[in-house]
Structure formats: C-alpha cells, structure tokens
From Swiss-Prot:
Top-rank taxon, per record: Eukaryota
Gene Ontology biological process terms, A to Z: defense response to bacterium; defense response to fungus; killing of cells of another organism
Family matches, as InterPro entries: Antimicrobial_frog_1 (IPR012520)
Cellular compartments annotated: Secreted
A cellular-component GO term for this protein: extracellular region
Stated name of the protein: Brevinin-1SPb
Tissue specificity: Expressed by the skin glands.
SS bond partners: 14-20
Lineage, opening ranks: Eukaryota, Metazoa, Chordata, Craniata, Vertebrata
Stated role: Antimicrobial peptide with activity against Gram-negative and Gram-positive bacteria (MIC=50 uM against E.coli, MIC=6 uM against S.aureus) and fungi (MIC=13 uM against C.albicans). Shows hemolytic activity on human erythrocytes (HC(50)=25 uM).
Pfam families: Antimicrobial_1 (PF08018)
Length: 20
C-alpha cells in the first residue's frame, strides 16, 4: 500500500466530507 495513494484518498475524503 503506497503512502502517496493513501494521502490522495485522504484529500478526496476531506474534500467530500469536509472533515479534515
């Protein structure tokens, strides 16, 4: 599991849910 992909997923989730 790549940390970069994890970071990208976190950004997407943050943008969608507004929970950062």
């Amino acid at each position: 599991f790549l940390p970069i992909i994890a970071g990208m997923a976190a950004k997407v989730i943050c943008a969608i849910t507004k929970k950062c």
